[in-house]
């Protein structure tokens, strides 16, 4: 949930105004965690999105379900996507490329060790912001 909300928020989808920081498993927001605990067990509600925002959600959904995740579980794939974007936007220098981001990811997260899948993840997730 954290990683998906992070990416949607960065794509401009109005899902809240959460501050994210780096954590063991990538971008994390304590405010979002608090909101999730508060809402846990309550009846859900329907979110109405503009056509543009619905398209953004759809684009992210398609990337999350991409066959390019190779041997990663869904959870690890989303962790790689969100972590790569966070590293590229918040940690690395402005001119960092895919190899730089993937090298940093693999250094910080040795369990995300499929280099080709990580390169694909970087290209896919950064494509959301072009």
What are the roles of these predicted feature ranges?
Residues 1-130:
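Domain-edge interaction signal
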């Amino acid at each position: 949930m954290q990683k998906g909300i992070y990416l949607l928020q960065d794509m401009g989808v109005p899902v809240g105004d959460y501050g994210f920081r780096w954590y063991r498993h990538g971008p994390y927001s304590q405010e979002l965690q608090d909101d999730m605990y508060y809402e846990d067990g309550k009846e859900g509600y329907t979110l109405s999105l503009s056509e543009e925002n619905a398209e953004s959600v759809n684009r992210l959904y398609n990337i999350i379900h991409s066959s390019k995740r190779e041997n990663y579980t869904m959870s690890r794939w989303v962790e790689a996507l969100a972590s790569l974007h966070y590293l590229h936007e918040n940690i690395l220098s402005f001119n960092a490329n895919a190899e730089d981001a993937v090298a940093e990811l693999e250094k910080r997260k040795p369990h995300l060790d499929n280099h080709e899948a990580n390169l694909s993840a970087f290209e896919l997730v950064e494509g959301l912001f072009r």
